[in-house]
Amino acid sequence: MGEVDIARVNQNIIKAKHYGAKLKAVPGTLKEAITDAIKTWTTNPDYAYICGSVVSANPFPKIVAFAQSIIGKEIREQSIEQEGKIPNMIVGCVGGGSNFAGAIYEFLDEASVKKIGVEAHETAALTNGTPGIMQGMKTYMLQTEDGAKSLGGMSLGAGITYFSVGPLHSYLKDQKAVTYSSATDAEMLE
């Protein structure tokens, strides 16, 4: 886990350690942690690699999106129970994209449900980035013009400071199946 993220999400660390997790801190954020995890996994045959977001190489984004789809199933069930119909719109925040992928997964074939993902403006890969390849995925990312270096930013939300986004969201953007926009920290606090 990135040292920056460790400092910001201490409660998650406490829970993970309670369940026996061993934590390896690496300098940086989620980006550096994923890169380090992939390097460690590919050089140690006894290790397994599991990613908790819809980022990284296939099949990990699909596995996580499927697991997170329980969110969309709950949205469907509760909407029908409380409103008598499925929702007209689903709006959610997008960092790497796992929570929002889970929220909309159940509704991808429902054209009547408008889907809006909102990124932190400071790290908005879908709205401000360009296509690139890193960490085993082709997706939109914040990077230098020549693609040689990834760029990042900081936001108040620890989970939305990733320099890129899962490839599912890139595909949905390109297919115009989901609308993506961004909001600044100040706008989010209003």
Stretches found by the model and what they are:
Residues 60-74:
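A glycine-rich, Thr/Ser-enriched phosphate-binding loop motif common to dinucleotide/cofactor-binding enzymes
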Residues 1, 85-100, 118:
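A short, small-residue-rich loop immediately preceding and capping a beta-strand
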Residues 1-38, 125-134:
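Active-site-proximal loop->helix
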Residues 16, 75, 90-92, 97, ...:
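Buried hydrophobic positions in well-ordered alpha/beta secondary-structure cores of metabolic enzymes
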Residues 77-85:
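Phosphate/pyrophosphate-binding loops at sites that engage ATP/ADP/AMP, CoA/4′-phosphopantetheine
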